[in-house]
Amino acid sequence: GDRAALHQALVRIRRDFGFDIVNVVDPQGTVLVRANNPDAFGDSMGHYRTIQEVLRTRAAVAGTGILDYSSIRNEGTELAERTLIPVVPTPRARPRSSPREDHAMVIKIAAPIIAGDRLAGILYAAVLLNNNTEFIDRFKRLVFKDEKIHGRDVGTATIFLGDIRVATN
């Protein structure tokens, strides 16, 4: 089909629904177009569990996941930069070989694109949780309802990837 028109549709989906990543892959898991990085296509997302599950069931699936840095780099420079979390050495913390965490924690969905009676492709979308203050602030408001004691917030919310804080308020 028309890659430019498909790209524009994915950009609208990303904007309207607040996703960070929106891609379409073919039935073999090969990337056809990315909303963020339309020039990066032809690589495979067939190893992603959500893609495999859609291929198996022909039904939409959702969940959380971890993407390695090479996968997130395919989504564009901005998301790759947002993924990086500096590791600050602290007492009693497990020693790390890298000065930064470069894996991306995401909330993801994948849904079949059906044409007639055949699987034409898969829509994959995700929200990046690394450094996502908007998400963690919304989560905190849901849990703690903006309660305060003596003018101070009752609670905080933090998302961990292993022992690294990827988002906190």
Task: Please tell me what each predicted stretch does.
Residues D20, Y48, S71-T83, V88-R96, ...:
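A short beta-strand signature within small-molecule sensing/ligand-binding domains used
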Residues G1-E75, R94, N130-T168:
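Extracytoplasmic/periplasmic sensory segments of membrane signal-transduction proteins
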Residues L84-T90, D102-K140:
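Conserved beta-strands of PAS-like sensory domains
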Residues S98-E101, A115-R118, I149-H150, V166:
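Short, solvent-exposed loop/turn segments that connect beta-strands within catalytic domains
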